[in-house]
């Protein structure tokens, strides 16, 4: 069982694999699991290969469109809160202990504050990546964008970028 799933179970959350599409969407979200908590849905996503905004196959607009579609479907189905926790890693198996701990802290905050609306939490993303979403926050209907960096973030960015150059 993946370490992120273990963290979700610590909070008593029921989780669902995202190896399938969410509700009536025709594509599956990135990552590991989604969690339904009362009238909220939490998407815990592992962005394999780091979603480097300088990489030619990645566009921030695509990411925003996908997340907004997930949010719209959830809200249409009666959810009052949609939260994304996005973890930047090389591969699913490379989520590091510090990142798992950061996800645990974000989940604890969500669990205690029960936020309403649309929130995005980035774990170990470059500032320029997060800035794209922050700058479009109002237009996208996002209530908050938060970023968290673990202590090994800079080293991990170098490693991911080196693997992209191969």
Q: How should these model regions be labeled?
A:
Residues 1-166:
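Nucleic-acid endo/exonuclease domains
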């Amino acid at each position: 069982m993946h370490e992120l799933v273990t963290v979700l179970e610590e909070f008593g959350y029921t989780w669902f694999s995202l190896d399938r599409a969410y509700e009536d969407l025709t594509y599956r979200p990135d990552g590991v699991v989604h969690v339904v908590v009362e009238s909220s849905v939490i998407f815990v996503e592992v962005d394999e290969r780091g979603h480097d905004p300088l990489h030619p196959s990645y566009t921030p607009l695509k990411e925003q469109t996908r997340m907004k579609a997930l949010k719209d479907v959830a809200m249409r189905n009666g959810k009052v809160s949609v939260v994304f926790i996005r973890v930047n890693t090389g591969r699913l198996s490379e989520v590091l202990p510090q990142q798992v701990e950061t996800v645990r802290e974000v989940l604890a905050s969500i669990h205690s504050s029960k936020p309403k609306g649309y929130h995005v939490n980035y774990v170990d993303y470059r500032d320029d990546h997060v800035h794209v979403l922050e700058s479009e926050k109002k237009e996208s209907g996002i209530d908050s964008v938060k970023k968290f960096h673990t202590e090994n973030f800079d080293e991990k960015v170098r490693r991911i970028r080196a693997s992209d150059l191969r």
